[in-house]
UniProtKB/Swiss-Prot annotation:
Any Gene Ontology CC annotation: phycobilisome
InterPro entries named among the record's database cross-references: Globin-like_sf (IPR009050), Phycobilisome_asu/bsu (IPR012128), Phycobilisome_asu/bsu_sf (IPR038719)
Keyword Membrane part of the UniProt annotation: yes
Subcellular location field: Plastid, Chloroplast thylakoid membrane
Species this protein is from: Agarophyton chilense
Chief site of localization: plastid
Name used for this protein in its record: R-phycoerythrin beta chain
Record family assignment: Belongs to the phycobiliprotein family.
Magnesium listed as a keyword: no
Subunit text: Heterododecamer of 6 alpha and 6 beta chains. The basic functional unit of phycobiliproteins is a ring-shaped hexamer formed from two back-to-back trimers contacting via the alpha chain subunits. The trimers are composed of alpha/beta subunit heterodimers arranged around a three-fold axis of symmetry. The phycoerythrins also contain a gamma subunit which is located in the center of the hexamer.
């Protein structure tokens, strides 16, 4: 995983060139938006339990068979595993947002996730639905449209951060589909 600075330096070094022009402008933008990024990560962290439990509850409401005998969320152990997986996925989304780089998702979260879920008999469509609910919830928190919030409102336009988070969620959904 490379942060924005390491990525720029690595690219410039590979070209045997100085860092300048558009690379410096991109870093300036990254720095100026840094407080928004930190606030967004803080909102995810502060509301993670609610975001994940709402996503899993929503997934189950749409597919009640998941909590019937034989369903993938039936028994406390399986429900706990489902909630744990949701927390892990959301945690890696927050890491990617903090770094401004999605490679942490590929390297540490998505690599082999689909195969593991298939081997365990986890319905991938339910996973995709839970991720889409998390995407909507996180987007609402970041863009200040969530009805219940913990903390202050992020100042300024955060649509770029909301779009970035949406792209991470879409990447996760595509990886497990």
């Amino acid at each position: 995983m490379l942060d924005a600075f390491s990525r720029v330096i690595s690219n410039a070094d590979a070209k045997a060139a100085y860092v300048g022009g558009s690379d410096l402008q991109a870093l300036r933008t990254f720095i100026s938006d840094g407080n928004k990024r930190l606030d967004a990560v803080n909102y995810i962290v502060s509301n993670s339990s609610c975001i994940v439990s709402d996503a899993i509850s929503g997934m189950i409401c749409e597919n009640p068979g998941l909590i019937t005998p034989g369903g993938n969320c039936y028994t406390n152990r399986r429900m706990a595993a489902c909630l744990r997986d949701g927390e892990i996925i959301l945690r890696y989304i927050s890491y990617a947002l903090l770094a401004g780089d999605s490679s942490v998702l590929e390297d540490r979260c998505l690599n082999g996730l689909k195969e593991t879920y298939i081997a365990l008999g986890v319905p991938t469509n339910s996973t995709v639905r839970a991720v889409s609910i998390m995407k909507a919830a996180v987007g609402a928190f970041i863009s200040n449209t969530a009805s219940q919030r913990k903390g202050e409102v992020i100042e300024g336009d955060c649509s770029a951060l909301a779009a970035e988070i949406a792209s991470y969620c879409d990447r996760i959904s595509a990886a497990v589909s």
